[in-house]
Amino acid sequence: GAVGEIQILLNNIASQLNGDQKKADKV
């Protein structure tokens, strides 16, 4: 459903933000 798709998009954005934070921590 639409709600599920939105949740997936939010999860993808969250994972991308987490990845950016991890990269920043490494620097």
UniProtKB/Swiss-Prot annotation:
**One of the record's GO cellular component terms:** trichocyst
Q: What does this protein do?
A: Structural protein that crystallize inside the trichocyst matrix.
- Give the stretches traversing the membrane: none
Similarity remark:
Belongs to the TMP family.
Q: Which residues form the signal peptide?
A: none
* Disulfide bond sites: none
Where is this protein localized, as stated in its record? Trichocyst
| Coiled-coil regions, chain positions | none
Q: What is this protein called?
A: Trichocyst matrix protein T4-C
